[in-house]
Amino acid sequence: MEPFEQHTGIAASLIQINIDTDAIIPSREIKSVSKKGLENGLFAEWRYTSLNTRKETPAFILNQEPYRRASFILTGENFGCGSSREHAVWALYQWGIRAIVAPSFGSIFYSNCIQNGILPVLLETEKIRKLKTFVELNPAINQLTVDLKDATIIAGNDIRYSFEIEPNNQQNLLQGLDAIGSTLKIIPTIEAFEKNDHRNRPWVYFK
């Protein structure tokens, strides 16, 4: 996983509540455990008029320029609710999404974002509306910047919002560590504990 420190990019607005993981990537789009190609199924029910022909729906924001190159999503409450499928986060990442800004997230989806290099930014609805207004004045030029070290999101010269993120999640993203990487980092601590525990409770280790 790549370290996440700062990112600047185009933001697409999907201001709806309760966008669930089945909307993000329908189950029929999940044909393997591979991440490759999942971006083609991202928001498939909304992006295509026909799932068979893959004819695009012109009105859907990610089918429009410059939003085809969006790396931020501005959205509503409870984004990523529903089933726990990690493919939803994989599809977003494969598309190029690096940060999602919402008032709240599905709890498992939020954790999956952290584990896969997407920054979930918790921000109040009114602040998201102001970001949306800024972006839509000139979406190709009016890009957003998120600085994870400072936990701030920046829009132009006048808008700068702080957001909260648990220190452990922040450090894992900054260092590019998923759950396995975090565990490998503390192997010496684990081995020291096992050695001490073996000495104090030898019966636990009988075979």
Question: What are the residue ranges of the model-derived segments?
Answer:
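Cytosolic catalytic domains that perform sulfur/thiol-centered chemistry
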Residues: M1-G76, G80-K207
